């Protein structure tokens, strides 16, 4: 652990001084992309954009902003995710609130959104199982690739805390017709006559035994429930694939995000359930 106090902080007068110092602290703490994170935290604290920073890099930083900045730098040096410190991230060009109750949306999942968008239109009914932050279903709705009527865009999650985050993201992205349902998989959907053109899911898919070896930022700060795919990582693919036929329209699609080494096994699951 690294501890910083007034005795080991060099003189910091300008914007540039602060960011350089922040980057140095993060580099010493083995943070990936320390320069990027140091600048992002500075922009967050000061409320300026990159262009303003570059133009005014030699401006004097006020003491209160510097104090806040150093607090955030120390948090980041302890491997608290950048997005958790700021409370938001960007996904598919839109802002999303994130916290310890949801996975931070990742670039790989943007690819899933792109692929589903190719299969959908403004008339499509889409179910996002294990919705988490809501980034998948909200992105599709924002793109106009879901039906805007009842049950046109549905996100399901077992976690009420995650659904609270998704509700906030639905509000800030102005897609009021996205329906969020608390349910253990399909349980709360049974008997409601819901049918979908696409079921999409980025479920928990990491084998339990692997989680303890994950990067500290994931292992300690992402919710375990959103990571753990049981013994072989495939539990939720089996459940969703088994139930999907009851909720898909004829010629509907089932779309998954999968782990880098799971393609063959998930294909086998899909084949085994027809």
Question: What residue spans do the PLM features occupy?
Answer:
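Conserved Class I SAM-dependent methyltransferase catalytic core
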Residues: 231-274
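Conserved hydrophobic residues forming the short capping helix/wall of the S-adenosyl-L-methionine
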Residues: 26, 144, 170, 244, ...
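Conserved AdoMet
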Residues: 44-119
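Conserved SAM/SAH cofactor-binding pocket of Class I
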Residues: 107-213, 261
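Class I S-adenosylmethionine-dependent transferase superfamily signal
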Residues: 116, 140, 218, 240, ...
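Non-catalytic accessory regions of SAM-dependent methyltransferases
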Residues: 1-46, 53-54
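Short clusters of hydrophobic/aromatic residues that line enzyme substrate/ligand-binding pockets
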Residues: 53, 61, 86, 189, ...
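Mobile active-site "lid"/loop adjacent to the S-adenosyl-L-methionine
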Residues: 149, 205-235
């Amino acid at each position: 652990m690294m501890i910083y106090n007034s005795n080991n902080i060099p003189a910091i007068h300008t914007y540039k001084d602060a960011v350089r110092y922040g980057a140095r602290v993060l580099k010493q703490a083995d943070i990936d992309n320390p320069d990027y994170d140091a600048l992002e935290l500075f922009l967050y604290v000061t409320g300026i954009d990159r262009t303003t920073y570059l133009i005014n890099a030699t401006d004097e930083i006020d003491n209160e902003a510097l104090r806040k900045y150093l607090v955030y730098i120390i948090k980041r040096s302890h491997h608290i995710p950048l997005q958790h410190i700021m409370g938001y991230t960007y996904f598919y060009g839109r802002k999303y609130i994130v916290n310890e109750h949801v996975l931070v949306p990742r670039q790989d999942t943007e690819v899933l959104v792109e692929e589903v968008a190719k299969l959908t239109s403004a008339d499509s009914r889409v179910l996002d199982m294990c919705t988490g932050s809501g980034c998948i279903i909200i992105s599709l709705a924002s793109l106009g690739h879901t039906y805007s009527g009842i049950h046109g865009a549905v996100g399901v999650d077992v976690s009420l805390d995650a659904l609270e985050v998704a509700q906030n993201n639905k509000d800030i992205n102005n897609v009021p017709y996205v329906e969020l349902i608390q349910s253990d998989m399909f349980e709360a959907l049974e008997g409601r006559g819901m049918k979908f053109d696409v079921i999409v899911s980025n479920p928990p898919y990491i084998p339990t035994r692997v989680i303890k070896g994950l990067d500290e930022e994931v292992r300690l700060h992402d919710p375990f429930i959103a990571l753990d795919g049981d013994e072989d990582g495939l539990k939720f693919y089996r459940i969703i694939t088994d139930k999907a036929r009851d909720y898909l329209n004829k010629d509907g699609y089932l779309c998954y995000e999968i782990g880098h080494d799971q393609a063959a096994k998930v294909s086998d699951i899909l084949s085994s359930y027809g």
